[in-house]
């Protein structure tokens, strides 16, 4: 099978970008605006706000009537849905896209043929298609319940009496009555629209690998939901059953057919490195997100001191469908600073539909309609500039390093408020980008020694890609004592570094100058 992918890095870039789309909500919007039978074929990719390396289309798989019915009756969920949609109607609740009855494209989305065409259209952009894989559980009405009940964790009458929120009694097609466990993690009650898969059963593991091999022909990568739950130590802690490792064998099986296939893990509990070692290409960086959200700049910087072999596999984000919207968590200027820290670090840069517009209302994966919200033009303008900066070849495929800020004068400790990076071409010691962020609610100052390597010119021109301001600094002073930086609260700068000769040549080419900032 030909996949017609661009001949660059296997994943588009060493530090690729990803855009998550709420497929069903997008389709509902199209259906309400003149195309009532719209499928994946009607999704106009040209309307997307940027060209990304990856597009993750959320919730394309077939779901069932049982999950839909549960979602429409669950009192707690209904409260959440009404907060999102005050005019909530039953048709807005389709059931969770993670309560899957079959890994075939949902019939309401156009089926597998429409999905194949979507993949071709994504490839035509020079991009790649990512879809969901939910390893921990299946929907209650999945065919395996009758065909292979041994694929699921089963319980007893005592289990369901002791924890009715975690078990369900079902009557099979043959008349047998069995008690099944809901899918869950060890810290929360079960997901009541799902059944827990039994990874202690080798036949179940084989069946899941067969699904993965099929999916590898239908997309280019998978975002693996709660991937750490099927690690043997976590599975045994939750269910008291020993199992063999799943991920190394599963990932190896897929990559033996498609070496360029991408596995991205949703993972928490400091298990990122473990899953990277088991074969995952990328793992969620929830720790950086949490530390930025909690304004812990020192802890965030310490996290970024980890080795590049770890950092380059991290997925940096400020929001996704599980988290509150970034514009709710982070005030305007703080969000901009957090975005520069997150997305100028190495790894995958993960953006969420609605993030660029400053949307504030989180949409449950059970819903297929979102609320009307106005666009925050200030946030939109910021992300437009940030995305342009992220298109730079050096930050997509170059080498990254974390820089330290020294005290600007005795007794001034605001240097601890800074996070700074340098980017250079692969194998080069010539810095091309300098990133400086004051992650604090007050003015801060520092000196940042800049390792300019074999830079031969006396003057360095620094062009701020977020403000278009231009600065000239002495190269020797930038080395020692360092570049003096004074920034206001939550202020960030992304500098493009050039020699004075390069800058003058560009001025002559465009026939003018922007002037110099101080």
Where are these regions (language model features)?
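Active-site and adjacent substrate-binding regions of carbohydrate-active enzymes
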Residues: 2-518
């Amino acid at each position: 099978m030909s996949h017609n992918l661009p001949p660059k890095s296997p994943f588009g870039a060493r530090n690729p970008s990803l855009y998550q789309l709420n497929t069903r909500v997008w389709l509902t919007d199209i259906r309400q605006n003149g195309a009532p039978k719209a499928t994946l074929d009607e999704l106009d990719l040209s309307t997307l706000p940027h060209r990304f390396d990856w597009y993750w289309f959320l919730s394309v798989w077939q779901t069932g009537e049982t999950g839909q019915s549960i979602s429409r009756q669950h009192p707690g969920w209904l409260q959440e849905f009404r907060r999102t949609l005050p005019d909530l109607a039953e048709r807005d609740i389709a059931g969770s896209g993670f309560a899957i009855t079959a890994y075939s494209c949902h019939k309401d989305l156009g089926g597998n043929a429409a999905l194949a065409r979507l993949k071709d259209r994504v490839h035509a952009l020079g991009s790649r298609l990512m879809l969901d894989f939910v390893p921990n559980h299946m929907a209650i009405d999945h065919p395996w319940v009758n065909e292979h009940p041994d694929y699921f964790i089963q319980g007893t009458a005592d289990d369901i009496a002791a924890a009715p929120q975690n078990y369900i009694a079902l009557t099979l097609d043959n008349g047998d009555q069995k008690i099944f466990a809901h899918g869950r993690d060890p810290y929360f009650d079960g997901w009541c629209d799902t059944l827990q898969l039994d990874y202690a059963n080798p036949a179940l593991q084989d069946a899941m690998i067969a699904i993965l091999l099929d999916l590898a022909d239908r997309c280019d990568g998978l975002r693996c939901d709660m991937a750490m739950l099927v690690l043997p130590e976590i599975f045994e802690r939750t269910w008291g059953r020993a199992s063999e490792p799943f991920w190394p064998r599963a990932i190896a099986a897929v990559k033996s057919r498609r070496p360029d296939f991408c596995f991205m893990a949703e993972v928490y509990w400091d298990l990122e490195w473990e899953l990277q070692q088991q074969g995952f290409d990328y793992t969620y960086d929830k720790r950086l997100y949490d530390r930025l959200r909690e304004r812990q700049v020192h802890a965030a910087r310490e996290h970024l001191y980890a080795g590049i072999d770890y950092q380059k596999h991290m997925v940096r984000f400020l929001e996704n469908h599980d988290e509150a919207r970034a514009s709710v968590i982070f005030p305007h200027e703080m969000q901009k600073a957090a975005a520069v820290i997150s997305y100028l670090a190495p790894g995958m840069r993960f953006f969420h539909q609605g993030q660029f517009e400053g949307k504030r209302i989180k949409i449950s994966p059970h819903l297929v309609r979102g609320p009307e919200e106005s666009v925050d033009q200030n946030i939109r303008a910021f992300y437009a500039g940030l995305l342009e900066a992220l298109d730079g070849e050096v930050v997509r495929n170059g080498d990254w390093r974390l820089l330290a800020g020294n005290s600007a004068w005795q007794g001034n400790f605001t240097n601890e408020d800074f996070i700074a990076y340098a980017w250079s071409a692969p194998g080069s010691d010539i810095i091309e980008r300098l990133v400086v962020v004051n992650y604090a609610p007050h003015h801060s100052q520092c000196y940042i020694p800049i390792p300019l390597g074999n830079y031969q010119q006396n003057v360095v021109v620094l062009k701020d890609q977020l403000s278009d301001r231009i600065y000239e600094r002495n190269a020797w002073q930038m080395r020692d004592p360092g570049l003096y930086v004074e920034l206001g609260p939550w202020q960030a700068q992304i500098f493009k570094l050039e020699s004075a000769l390069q800058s003058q040549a560009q001025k002559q080419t465009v026939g003018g100058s922007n002037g110099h900032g101080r």
